[in-house]
């Protein structure tokens, strides 16, 4: 499952919670404005003797402050919803290697990494469990596929096991080029676009 599909699924789940949170925020907004109108009305009456202009100014000031407070509350709830969705996305990211489709995702990340550094003699770094997923026959097939695509001899040598959730890190033999396609690095690189997508889908 690609990052976009994963994000879409999590956002879909989060949308239910978002609707509830936003409904509560809107109710609170209405309560703030209602209370402000009542307060403004009372103060307007209290200072009516001082003149209609002063009363109107006081009323407008109170209502403006209430609108600002309500808007701030909505923005806070919106940010909270986005943050909760991101946290859920990170939780699902940790679970991704347990899913049936993970091997396909891992292969795509490896291919992307090989493209990024330009092929040649490369070092493949995975976590311990993923080295079991990518056996020698799979590695050989990857090398052949990349040679055909890049028109360049490509050798993938297994390096040391890394403490990563999943995904891969590809290095050239001289370590001058590195492509970090670990799941966590990929998530961090796409964090801004993921936030924007969540906001677009939820709001």
From Swiss-Prot:
The keyword Cell inner membrane does not apply. It is found in: Cell membrane. It is a peripheral membrane protein. Keywords: ATP synthesis, Cell membrane, Hydrogen ion transport, Ion transport, Membrane, Transport. One of its GO terms (cellular component) is proton-transporting two-sector ATPase complex, catalytic domain. InterPro entries: ATPase_E_C (IPR038495), ATPase_V1_Esu (IPR002842). One of its GO terms (molecular function) is proton-transporting ATP synthase activity, rotational mechanism. The keyword Ribonucleoprotein does not apply. SUPFAM superfamilies: V-type ATPase subunit E-like (SSF160527). GO terms for biological process: proton motive force-driven plasma membrane ATP synthesis. Component of the A-type ATP synthase that produces ATP from ADP in the presence of a proton gradient across the membrane. Belongs to the V-ATPase E subunit family. Has multiple subunits with at least A(3), B(3), C, D, E, F, H, I and proteolipid K(x). This is A-type ATP synthase subunit E. The gene is atpE.
